[in-house]
């Protein structure tokens, strides 16, 4: 879901709301 935190390969976690 878009409201779930996405984990990127650079180690940064971005939450798309």
UniProtKB/Swiss-Prot annotation:
The biological process GO terms on file are:
adaptive immune response
- Taxonomically, the superkingdom here is Eukaryota
Keywords, alphabetical? Adaptive immunity, Cell membrane, Immunity, Membrane, Receptor, T cell receptor
Where located? Cell membrane
Subunit and partners = Alpha-beta TR is a heterodimer composed of an alpha and beta chain; disulfide-linked. The alpha-beta TR is associated with the transmembrane signaling CD3 coreceptor proteins to form the TR-CD3 (TcR or TCR). The assembly of alpha-beta TR heterodimers with CD3 occurs in the endoplasmic reticulum where a single alpha-beta TR heterodimer associates with one CD3D-CD3E heterodimer, one CD3G-CD3E heterodimer and one CD247 homodimer forming a stable octameric structure. CD3D-CD3E and CD3G-CD3E heterodimers preferentially associate with TR alpha and TR beta chains, respectively.
Q: What does this protein do?
A: J region of the variable domain of T cell receptor (TR) beta chain that participates in the antigen recognition. Alpha-beta T cell receptors are antigen specific receptors which are essential to the immune response and are present on the cell surface of T lymphocytes. Recognize peptide-major histocompatibility (MH) (pMH) complexes that are displayed by antigen presenting cells (APC), a prerequisite for efficient T cell adaptive immunity against pathogens.
Q: What name is this protein filed under?
A: T cell receptor beta joining 1-6
Q: Per the UniProt entry, what species is this protein from, by scientific name?
A: Homo sapiens (Human)
Q: Which gene encodes it?
A: TRBJ1-6
